[in-house]
Swiss-Prot record:
Residues 852-980, 1021-1145 form the RGS domain. Residues 1142-1174 form a coiled coil. Residues 565-587 are annotated as: Disordered. Residues 568-578 have a biased composition (Polar residues). The keyword Repeat applies. PROSITE patterns: RGS. It comes from the Eukaryota. Inhibits signal transduction by increasing the GTPase activity of G protein alpha subunits thereby driving them into their inactive GDP-bound form. Keywords: Coiled coil, Cytoplasm, Nucleus, Repeat, Signal transduction inhibitor. The gene is RGS22. This is Regulator of G-protein signaling 22. GO terms for cellular component: actin cytoskeleton; cytoplasm; cytosol; fibrillar center; nucleus. It comes from Homo sapiens (Human).
């Protein structure tokens, strides 16, 4: 079984190696782009790895993509699957496909602002890199690199973790040797081991002259020695033995040519024949010492030569190349130059590799190989014809790995799948312990350092911790003793914490994505789908969430509701504004997990489905732990009777500071991902109130999360509330936030029992307080950013939709043109193959084979035809690149500014992953690496200018493809032959340039998508409004128009608030129980049907009734949160409604609307009754004569008994419900009157009361 060595030491990014790592490490690009686009920073920046430049975030590519998709949908026929109504045969019409006009052009170019390369790098290193190196983004990047080492193969893999093994060394070009610091004479003296002593100046001078003269012809050595010939390893003596013989310990040696050495040895063998041992004398040395090398008879070491390959494909490609090279050499008659990766299989007798083809019973191995080759070619074609954001999902990578019989975690999306895979397992605990150790290592402040250690103990050591580790694991890590929880010991065990992830969880993840898992039985797949898919509720009244997040996170950024359809594609220097508000969350609980659009979007969010986490635990959130651990409560059902469309309006953006406050909350939410950028600003400011307020906000979020667990723990809630009060609010608090004395007293009076709104006043106070440092930080960051020069660049969108539109456009061409295109297109798949290039020239007629590329340059007319030929086949980039470099070479050296500008232009346009370093590059991968080494390394791609030799080398590769590929295709075309016969046939076939490599699109990081999120300031404002008598009365009338039970829900919420005040008043327990009973009888278990008078799930109501005593003061917690979420949905609509009205007019307008709705319902009921009476009357008239029944139509037959069609109208149903409600209300009032009076009502009998009730009901009905 093959072995693979892994390292437990993650890569370390330094300022010196940052550029090289950013240019070569895709993981680093992903995480650094996520960091740069966080809402903490005033300007959203991203690094474009294709062009090697930092760009200002721009939504123009996504907007263009939507436009192209819309155009394509208009051009293509409608999919019949969407035709719900089945049409008759005569109604079906042939679908007409609207092909685009030939002259129609679609502009796929867009402008984007880029940071100046030199200034941008300096600004990034100064303003962003230090914070990144202390952020969770960097820690997760290091962990991702470690996990990415794991690789799965069918033949098995034995993993070993080594301490002295590091694969993270950045490849750099060989550096020049340092200049000699010693004088030449001193070096010569050391070489010859001489001391001149008291020699005269003349003698010394003559001796040095003689030594220098002898040094020019022969090599030196220290002592003569003998080396047996059989100890010399083939193919060259100079590899090991030469260093041993000639090294004098002072200066290095240069390796001799292996071919010459082999030739020398072979000559010795021929001369000596069968002698057992021979010797040969080499050249004399300056010190006149004789060197003799003793040679023994050479053994045939090639007999057992074994070559090892990592995969079977690698062996096949090498062997096929060896066979083809021999065939080409025999055909051409000339030796073909060797490449570095060439292997001579004549000397190899045995081949071994890690992975091999599995023997499949009943199938032909050759057919299987051919099928695999076809699939791979189709996959390569598909990848080259699709953008990365559409085809580079985790599934496509998984399919690629399976087709190659391997699997690894080699990109960000696979790593996100691995995170999801270990969620809820022991591997997740190892994960977060490793991350917490990383966080601990960067904390410099002693206070924060100690607090983080305490939080880690509570999380991992205490039995009720969120990530509690068993005693066996703690004993293994030597963490059972609390004194061992120190930074030094945690650093020592960090590699041991990582080993379970590398040796078990990561290989297990890879194995689950193997071919056997992919091709599992249909029954197993169906069972897994049913388990993973949430159960659909068949209840006609959908339930609301068990727990609605009143305060999920005070800072979760919103997803904008209003999407602008049109905007300028030219990006201004400033980044887009932040979203103006944050919405309220209604998603399942999740812990320590972030949602990325590029990560779990393809995995979990597909075709509009929302990501719902499976976890139900909650993380104890502090300012020194992962802020993204906040849970959100589970949504089992939605509310009933209140289904309303989402209103595209923003509510009260002025509350608590407006948009600035929302930006502050967004920043606080992602502080851990941003390296606590804002927190450090407050710490360094010297203002203790700012620093304490930030700490309080983080700890307060942890307190809020305790209310969103499935099982509320009153003891933990009480303990956390007391901790917050004692640490931040109390008069003698160590981290006092400066709250007013009245508010402190108010919090103290309500601290027993504590509810989720206990610290609302304190939270509102600190948010307003933190607005000042936030504004100062943003301004200072913008000042530094404005010093960087911005350059506008024009880009071209590479989209699948655009290619499909081009395909539709090509259908209008003639069949002959299509055949020509196909013929030429088939020969461009393998441009680097020598045999293909020979075949290109074989297709050229003999009379045109004398044409060279230089002839085209001299013939301007043919050169223009050649340019059009390349444009026709979307390959004009080669000629453009060659022309631009040629223009650069012809610029005089004196004109330095023009040469510099041209060099920068060439580098920005061609030296990127869209062209020269992409899949359609004119150079091979080895040649690309040689070019980058010549230019100084991959890190140089981030700088402005390249040297002239580099550009000349690039031009050589471009010209090589032009001469060997495109020129023979051009000469073999019919158009060229027709022009040579003076039959001019001009045909312009123009297409847009299609780049072969997809543009990397790393969108601005968004933690959540398609979720209702709301900040704490909106929740506080809404809660205040519900407690305000005037506002609550207006809102009550407003929601009464939206649903039948919404008004009751508002009253229920207010009654629960009164119950909370009653608990804080410390009154008698019997009074509190009586209040609970009253609320239950009125809203949850009413004697008047329906029993449940508010919009909460039935299970929730049953839980309140059955466990009212066990729940204690939190008996109505879940129900109140559910109602709050239902009502909060209509709060933005109400705010929009009352904007244009005065307080005096609001009630009158609402009353008129209510009256209008009633009249509308009455008219609908009357119309339904009238239509029903007419139908019955008509039926009676037509059914009297029995003879006429045969003449009745089918519609009237349907009205006969047992065949009558049931009619149902929603408006009539609503009216009936309203009537029932009124009658029940009248009955309730009468019952109150009956039991209110003593003497007068005791004489009444049941019959009389019943008669009066019926009379009143009938009277009320007649009035209606």
């Amino acid at each position: 079984m093959p072995e693979k060595r892994l390292t437990a030491e993650p890569p370390t990014i330094t300022e010196e190696e940052f550029e090289d790592s950013l240019a070569t490490d895709d993981f680093l690009v992903d995480y650094f782009n996520e960091f740069l686009s966080l809402p903490t920073f005033s300007e959203a920046i991203r690094f474009n790895a294709d062009y090697g430049v930092f760009e200002v975030a721009n939504d123009a590519p996504q907007f263009l993509e939507k436009q192209l998709k819309k155009i394509l949908q208009n051009q293509q026929p409608r999919n019949p699957i969407y035709d719900v109504v089945r049409k008759g045969k005569n109604e079906v019409k042939p679908v007409q496909m609207n092909a685009p006009d030939e002259d129609e052009t679609i502009n796929v170019n867009y402008n984007i602002m880029c940071l100046s390369r030199e200034e941008g790098i300096k600004w990034i290193k100064k303003e962003r890199l230090p914070a990144f190196l202390e952020s969770d983004c960097y820690f997760e990047y290091r962990l991702a690199k470690l996990v990415s080492q794991v690789r799965w193969s069918k033949s098995g893999m034995n993993f070993t973790v080594g301490s002295n093994f590091s694969p993270w060394i950045v490849k750099k070009p060989p550096s020049l040797p340092p200049p000699a610091t010693e004088e030449d004479n001193l070096v010569i003296m050391k070489k010859f081991y001489v001391s001149l002593g008291e020699a005269s100046y003349t003698q010394t001078k003559d001796w040095f002259a003689l030594a220098k003269q002898s040094q020019q012809t022969v090599s030196t050595f220290s002592l003569p020695c003998c080396v047996p010939y059989n100890k010399l390893k083939s193919p060259a003596i100079s590899s090991v033995s030469e260093n041993f013989i000639f090294d004098d310990g002072v200066h290095p040696r240069t390796k001799k040519d292996p071919s010459k050495t082999n030739k020398l040895i072979s000559e010795f063998e021929e001369e000596e024949g069968e002698e057992e041992e021979v010797s040969v004398s080499l050249q004399d040395t300056p010190s006149q010492a004789l060197l003799r090398v003793y040679l023994e008879k050479k053994q045939d070491v090639d007999e057992s030569l074994t070559m090892h390959f990592s995969t079977c494909e690698e062996f096949l490609s090498s062997y096929i190349y060896f066979i083809l090279r021999g065939a080409i050499q025999q055909i051409v008659g000339k030796p073909v130059g060797e490449t570095p990766d060439y292997i001579n299989f004549n000397n190899i007798t045995k081949v071994s590799f890690d992975d091999c083809f599995e023997s499949i019973h009943g199938k032909n191995f050759l057919s299987e190989l051919v099928q695999t080759t076809k699939e791979r070619s189709e996959e390569i074609e598909q990848t080259s014809l699709s953008s990365k954001n559409e085809s580079a999902g985790p599934e496509s990578r998984a399919d690629w790995c399976i087709s190659h019989r391997t699997y690894d975690i080699g990109n960000r999306k696979e790593f996100e799948r691995f995170k999801k895979f270990i969620k809820g397992t022991l591997g997740e605990r190892y994960w977060w312990l490793w991350m917490d150790i990383e966080r601990l290592k960067v904390l410099k402040d002693p206070g924060r350092h100690q607090r983080h250690l305490e939080k880690m103990k509570k999380c991992y050591l205490v039995s009720n911790g969120d990530y509690y580790l068993s005693a066996e694991i703690l004993s293994k890590f030597k963490l059972l003793d609390g004194s061992q929880w120190n930074e030094e010991h945690l650093r020592n065990i960090q590699s041991e914490v990582l080993k379970p992830l590398l040796l078990y969880w990561a290989p297990r993840f890879c194995v689950t994505h193997s071919a056997s898992t992919k091709y599992a039985s249909a029954e197993l797949k169906f069972w897994h789908l049913r388990q993973a898919k949430p159960r659909k509720d068949i209840d006609p009244f959908p339930q609301m969430a068990t727990l609605l997040p009143l305060r999920p996170k005070s800072c979760i950024p919103q997803i904008p509701e209003i999407q602008k359809e049109e905007f300028s594609l030219s990006q201004p220097p400033k980044s887009p504004n932040k979203s103006p508000e944050v919405k309220t969350a209604t998603q399942k609980p999740w812990k320590r997990e972030l949602l990325y659009p590029g990560s779990s979007k393809d995995d979990v969010i597909e075709k509009g489905s929302k990501y719902m986490s499976e976890s139900s635990k909650v993380i104890h959130l502090t300012s020194f732990t992962d802020i993204s651990e906040c849970l959100k409560p589970q949504l089992d059902r939605r509310y009933a009777y209140t289904e309303e469309p989402r209103v595209k309006t923003v509510s009260d953006v002025g509350a608590l500071g407006g948009s600035d406050m929302e930006n502050l909350l967004q920043s606080l939410y992602v502080e851990n991902r941003a390296g606590f950028f804002f927190t450090k600003f407050c710490e360094h400011s010297g203002n203790k109130l700012w620093k304490n307020s930030v700490y309080f906000w983080f700890d307060l979020q942890a307190y809020h999360q305790l209310f969103y667990q499935e099982t509320l723990q009153p003891f933990k809630v009480c303990k956390q509330a007391q901790y917050l009060f004692a640490t931040y609010v109390a008069p003698s608090a160590t981290l006092d936030i400066g709250l007013q004395q009245e508010k402190k007293k108010e919090i103290y009076m309500k601290i027993q029992p504590p509810f989720e709104d206990l610290f609302d006043t304190a939270e509102e106070y600190i948010l307003l307080l933190l607005l000042e440092p936030w504004t100062k930080m943003v301004k200072s960051d913008q000042i530094a950013y404005k010093k960087v020069e911005l350059v506008e660049e024009t880009r071209q969108l590479d989209s699948t939709y655009f290619r499909k539109l081009q395909a539709l456009h090509k259908e209008t061409f003639s069949k002959k043109a299509e055949d020509t295109t196909c013929e030429i297109g088939t020969g461009i798949l393998s441009l680097s193959n020598v045999s293909k290039r020979t075949e290109y020239w074989d297709n050229v007629p003999a009379e045109y084979k004398h044409f060279k590329f230089s002839d085209l340059l001299n013939n301007k007319l043919e050169f223009e035809h050649f340019r059009q030929f390349l444009e026709t086949h979307s390959s004009s980039m080669d000629l453009m690149c060659w022309t631009d470099i040629e223009q650069f070479r012809r610029i005089t050296y004196r004109d330095r500014n023009q040469r510099k500008a041209k060099s920068i232009y060439i580098k920005n346009k061609y030296l990127n992953k869209k062209y020269f370093f992409g899949p359609n590059s004119p150079a091979s991968l080895y040649q690309q690496n040689q070019v980058m080494h010549l230019s100084g390394g991959w890190g140089k791609i981030l700088h402005e200018q390249l040297d002239a030799p580099v550009l000349v080398e690039i031009q050589k590769h471009v010209q090589n493809r032009l001469e060997n590929v495109w020129l023979p295709l051009f000469l073999a075309s019919e158009q060229f032959a027709a022009r040579q016969k003076i039959k001019v046939q001009m045909k312009d076939i123009a297409e847009e340039l299609l780049l072969q490599k997809a543009e990397k699109k790393i969108g601005v990081w968004k933690p959540v998508e398609s979720k209702w999120i709301s900040s704490s300031c909106k929740i506080i404002a809404f809660r205040k409004a519900l407690l305000n008598p005037v506002t609550s009365r207006q809102f009550q009338r407003f929601v009464a128009l939206k649903g039948d039970l919404l008004e009751n829900g508002l009253l229920f919420w207010q009654e629960v608030q009164k119950y909370k005040d009653l608990c804080h008043s410390h009154c008698d327990e019997s009074v509190i129980q009586k209040k609970i009973t009253t609320i239950i009888n009125c809203f949850i278990n009413s004697s008047i049907p329906p029993a449940l008078q508010i919009d909460i799930p039935v299970e929730q109501a049953q839980k309140i009734i059955e466990h009212r005593k066990e729940l204690g003061p939190y008996v109505f917690r879940e129900a109140q949160m559910t109602i709050f979420g239902v009502l909060f949905k209509f709060w933005p609509q109400f705010c929009e409604f009352r904007k244009n009205l005065t307080d005096e007019n609001i009630m009158s307008v609402l009353e008129r609307r209510q009256e209008y709705n009633k009249q509308k319902k009455k008219l609908a009921v009357l119309e339904d009754e009238k239509s029903g009476k007419d139908g019955i009357k008509q039926y009676a008239n037509t059914s009297v004569p029995a003879i006429k029944t045969a003449l009745l139509s089918d519609s009237f037959l349907g009205l006969q008994p047992y065949g009558r069609q049931p009619t149902w109208c929603y408006s009539k149903y609503i009216e009936a419900l309203e009537q029932e409600r009124i009658l029940l209300k009248i009955q309730e009032e009468l019952e109150k009157k009956l039991f209110a009076g003593l003497q007068p009502l005791t004489n009444f009998k049941a019959s009389s009361s019943t008669m009066s009730l019926k009379k009143n009901m009938s009277a009320h009905s007649s009035q209606k």
